[in-house]
Curated annotation (Swiss-Prot):
Coiled coil: none annotated. One of its GO terms (biological process) is very long-chain fatty acid catabolic process. Forms a heterodimer with PXA1. It comes from Saccharomyces cerevisiae (strain ATCC 204508 / S288c) (Baker's yeast). It is found in: Peroxisome membrane. GO terms for molecular function: ABC-type transporter activity; ATP binding; ATP hydrolysis activity; ATPase-coupled transmembrane transporter activity; long-chain fatty acid transmembrane transporter activity. The keyword Transmembrane applies. The chain crosses the membrane at residues 122-142, 166-186, 269-289, 364-384. Residues 127-417 form the ABC transmembrane type-1 domain. Involved in the import of activated long-chain fatty acids from the cytosol to the peroxisomal matrix. One of its GO terms (cellular component) is peroxisome. This is Peroxisomal long-chain fatty acid import protein 1. ATP binds at residues 505-512. Glycans are attached at residues 33, 39, 162, 230, 241, 267, 295, 560, 608, 620, 647, 836.
Amino acid sequence: MISTASAFYQKHRVNLLRSSYIILLLATLYNSNSSSSNNKTDKKDSESTVLENKKIEEGKETAVDREEDESSKEELTIVSKHSTDSEDGAIIIDKESKTNHKGGERKGKVDFLFKLLLHDKKCLILFITQAILLNIRTLLSLRVATLDGQLVSTLVRAQYANFTKILLGKWMILGIPASFINSLISYTTKLCAVTINRKVSDFLLSKYLSNHHTFYSVASAESVSEIQDNLTKDIYTFSMNSSLLLNQLLKPMLDLILCSFKLLTSNTSVMGEGTLALGLIVYASNSLLKLIQPNFTRLTMASASLESWFRSLHSNLHSSNEEIALLRGQKRELENVDYSFYRLVLFLNREIKARAIYDVATAFVIKYTWGAAGLVLCSIPIFFKNKPSEDTLQLKEPGNDMTADFITNRRLLVTASSSIGRFVELKRNIQQLRGIRLRLNKFNDLLDANKGDDEKEPRDERCIVEYDDSRIKFENIPLITPANQVLVPELSFDLKHGNHLLIIGPNGCGKSSLFRILGGLWPIRATPNKNHQSKLIMPRRTVDRDCAIFYLPQRPYMGNRSTFREQIIYPDSIEQFKERYHNDYDLGDADLIKILQLLDLEDLVTENMSLLLAQRTSKNDSQQLSTEDNQSPCAIKVRDAFSIVRNWSEELTIGVQQRLAMARMYYHKPKFAVLDECTSAVAPEMEQRMYENAQNFGISLISVCHRTSLWHFHNYLLKFDGKGGYQFGPFNPKERLCNEEKLLELNAILDQQVPLWERKLKDLTIAKESNIIRKSETNLNLFEKIEDPKTSKSNALFNANKGQRITSPTGQETSKRLPLFSQPSSSASSNLLRNNKSLNKKVKTKKEEGKER
């Protein structure tokens, strides 16, 4: 049985070993690049996160100590000042990592990135070309290894003629195609990265800016820094790593397979089995390395989030520099930036420690353990020779040179070892690529969840939406925020083209919410009342390439990298401008100048021409041109003034920006215009002209304005009370203003008189209470005198005359005057007693109330 198996093995030895090599390679590849990290590594990551939070808590407690060194003091100050942000930041990063990880586990759904790349012909051609070039380079590497063995063999035997022949005739000639192939591989790799970047960027940007609803919803759901990183840094990292992935994956596989096959056909009989044993050692050591492997996917995602947070703070500093400078908030902002950097440094320190331990173990195993095993394998034929005489004879034969075989095998084993080492490095790169892929998938899922259509407004299925270019009608439409806060349960009004609507109400009543629903930024909800039907009639965004409804916010948008012409025609492009005026710039610019003259903005054209003249003059002076080559001032045309690019948002005041935004509306001539306090920074005289010109252009105005001087431009009023109610109806500006003046006068009188009335009422109340208490005390004193026992023992009472004397019980006369009333009877005395008791209770009650006051 054993002999039969041995015979079978000897017969099929090559095929069995080759199959074993491939199976072992696939097992090693799967073990190295498995996506899930072990539980021990995750536990270590969680423990390190807890330790990091403990450090922050310790920093909070010890931040008061002023005697520590400067560096620790800065860290503790940062932590103490931002303790809340610390906890929030840690929670956000951890939750985001888990969310992204779960978001990547989209079972049954094809990854959009892979689908996108596989459907691109250029990417496929580049990948195939790269694979062919890698195969050619591997074959050239095998040939170079053989030539290295022959060169060393000729040197050992001192065959200088053969050495020169092999060096110049084979080795140098082989270097020409090898150099060309290496350069071509580098070129195709970079070209592939650019192609992937372009493809993914076009896909995500087209989806992100496909319509206003998607752009607004995603920008509200995600932070600006995250979106910027997803569209720039993440795409760049993904494209670079994806282009290198084939090189990192295919070349080691080809090297391992071809090198092992080459070793199998070596003159040494045990080299095939030794290579298999070496492969088993590699598999076992790779399994051990996996135990200390950090979770590179999680590290990549957390690092990207922290870097985005740090960059967002710097972006906020740049965008809000004036506000921060006026409030003297640079110290607080410095603490914010320092703290975010402190969080990033803490995380990077932990990441570096984890990577350092893993790199030490990897370097020792790859370079020394596998290298020693390869040396042992190569030395077996030399130290265990069965027939030394035959081997000595073989040294003389060029085809069976042991030195050449040793060098060749050693070179092949080194190549195979380095290839396996690249597999281990590939594990890290794949996990990092997976982290970036999860972030991009999360962003793509967010875009899919908020996708919309310019022609279809986001709405509830129970709500009916119709389009009429000459009418805006709300019928039982609730005003509900995205946070499900009900501002108005049901809103109904009807506005036809030619009428003008004024909207007033307190802050937070629903004015801006109405505009957001009308602009398609918020979804249209159905009324919760089942007995009512919600219906919205509104004009489309564009009608025959003309704008049907236009929005002017309080702070207009100004593009800083656009020309003066593009500022006025925004959101139209230059191509649409040329199409509108049949490629006649002079005609179009003349219309723009007429619009600017209506708003007293024609001086901007002169200012732009002056700037162009100054730029050309300074350019000519710097280049020291001759007088004939200098451009004269007349060479600057009006077209050039409209083509200048400036930092419009910073160089123009808010008032000029609002007038320029009004010029946009005049240019587009919409049927309806929503004006949300868009003239708050404009002079009253200019404001009157702006509204008057808008009505002359046939634009129906829907205005939110607090200046009563603009009320006469409207004939309908929509008033919100801030409690969910509203009033809609015709509007008489004169009557309303008259009533408003009377109301203001009445309020002024009330403001002046009511405090006086309240003060008088308070004084009267106090006087009344004091009088009651005084009378009660007087009656009580009189009653106490009547009930005095000395008085009751008197023998006789006389009439109450002022000078009358009475006789005391001792018979002596006294000059004491009697009170001016007679002796009461017993029944009258009892009645008086009862009355005084009740009065006494009332007096006590009043006293207690007075004390409480």
